[in-house]
């Protein structure tokens, strides 16, 4: 459930 930046796009992880 955390928000990270992957390849300049929003990436929502499983936690």
Curated annotation (Swiss-Prot):
Keywords tagged on the record: Cell wall, Secreted
Source superkingdom: Eukaryota
Organism this protein belongs to: Nicotiana tabacum
Family from the record: Belongs to the thaumatin family.
Major subcellular location class: secreted
Lineage: Eukaryota, Viridiplantae, Streptophyta, Embryophyta, Tracheophyta
Protein name per UniProt: Osmotin-like protein
Annotated localization: Secreted, Cell wall
GO cellular component, one term: extracellular region
């Amino acid at each position: 459930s955390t928000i990270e930046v992957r390849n300049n796009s929003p990436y929502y992880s499983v936690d």
